[in-house]
Amino acid sequence: AEFLNRVYTNAWLKLPVGKARYGVMLREDGIVMDDGTTTRISENHYHMTTTTAQAANVLSHLEYYLQLVWPELNVNVVSTTEQWAGAAIAGPNSRALLMKLFPNTDVSNEGLPFMGYKEADLFGIPAKIYRISFSGELAYEVNVESDFGNFMWEKIIEVGKEFQIQPYGTEALSTLRIEMGHVAGSELDGRTIPHDALSLIHISEPTRLARI
């Protein structure tokens, strides 16, 4: 947690196990380097996400500070990008769909609140569920081991037919983020400070729909 405190602009020491938090990472000159969510999986185990374009740079950034600036911190970082396959499920029926996919897991608003995390079973496959919204709507991210990525996708599409589920891509996601006032990737172009991107406002004021 102390390491996260130093590399992000916001506080992490009191983040409880099973919860995620949005963070903004700055360069030494105060320019936004990246943003993303980090989840506390267990007492000393965190799962950090980054933007796709900056994943390698963020890993190098973290390793540099651990090895040369704060060697006293007992922290190890490892990329798990290739180990997990993820799917974002968003929209007003996303919770109803999750209830079908995970019938033995409580995904109600009380059981899995906004920015919450749970481990679950997807038709016999271990899965991780994050209550995270990239578009401002009620949304979740489901991760499984990469070998089961196709299996997960097929199950989501199959079970989602009764909800008229439709795949959406990055262009649609970017439009949704702009409509909801979220920071879009094009705004983090290496010339942006947090105030310009209104990042800190979005940290403290998540959209109402995402919290229902």
Label every PLM stretch briefly.
Residues 1-45, 49-68:
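Extended, compositionally biased flexible segments
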Residues 41-204, 208-211:
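Conserved, structured C-terminal
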